[in-house]
UniProtKB/Swiss-Prot annotation:
Locations listed in the record: Cytoplasm
Family per record: Belongs to the uroporphyrinogen decarboxylase family.
Protein known as: Uroporphyrinogen decarboxylase
GO molecular function terms attached to this record: uroporphyrinogen decarboxylase activity
Major localization class: cytoplasm
Gene Ontology biological process: protoporphyrinogen IX biosynthetic process
Amino acid sequence: MGKTKAFNDTFLKACKGEKTDHVPAWYMRQAGRSQPEYRALKEKYGLFEITHQPELCAYVTRLPVEQYGVDAAILYKDIMTPLPAIGVDVEIKNGIGPVIDSPIRTKADIERLGELHPEEDLPYVLDTIQLLTKEQLNVPLIGFAGAPFTMASYMIEGGPSKNYHKTKALMYSEPETWMLLMNKLADMTITYIRAQVKAGVSAFQIFDSWVGALNAADYRTFIKPVMQRIFTELKSENVPMIMYGVGASHLVKDWHDLPLDVVGLDWRMSVDEARKEGLTKTLQGNLDPTILLSPWEVIEERAKDILDQGMKSDHFIFNLGHGVFPDVSPDTLKKLTDFIHDYSAKHKKSSI
């Protein structure tokens, strides 16, 4: 029997701003699309089968840890996973994304939404987490959920949108109906994350992919109170809490106000700029994923710049500003991870 690897808690330490031997790294969408092993799996099984069979899902979740040497695993699931359980039928269509044939657009639609019971509705999610825990994954496992605004935008628009005009129209014209939906989705998020933590995740990230469509004033009025409730109620779970959104640099100070541990940055705002804005909590990010399609010299230069900014504090985790593209080479991600670890370890050693 092979020797069990020691548990790597670098990511968890960085979430709290504790000293580490190197900067921890993991990548959004690190599991799946860019890996040949995953593509081979997709030739045998559909996405539904992979995500609903704990053994397959655990395998996909584990792959980047074994191949790239990242400091955390993130559960391989979709943010849409809990919606069918509350009465919203979702189909993931190739080349489009989540599609909802019966959008949620009225108060009556919202009132018909049910409650989430993870043990009954999503046993395959919890079984996957427990399987990874039993297999002694040697890095923390990150759970996640979609934020109420992003979930609502899919539910109201019926799928991806460029301008979210139906979503924003409901928010502006029927604020009470909007808040009813926000609170129902907040309840779902809290219940879902609690179940994931109970099953064994060591941290979680809330993805608000499309919240950048709102200005700061509207965010504070229509979204922030709900996010405050989510993080306040989940604080008792005693695991690091991460917030991330796309194109939302104008909202990071509002995120920083929330009782969370880590603020995720996309590539539009540098780490230095975020610190100048007064963000003292742990920052996570923020290499533009497109750069991973460039020559290695370019990747190294950009990664070094981000590390130099991030390492001014122990409150830093290296990630991308968005998810890994399908055409990124796994070798590039391995090389990047090694560079992050080696470069940051030398810096930290020399600064002792």
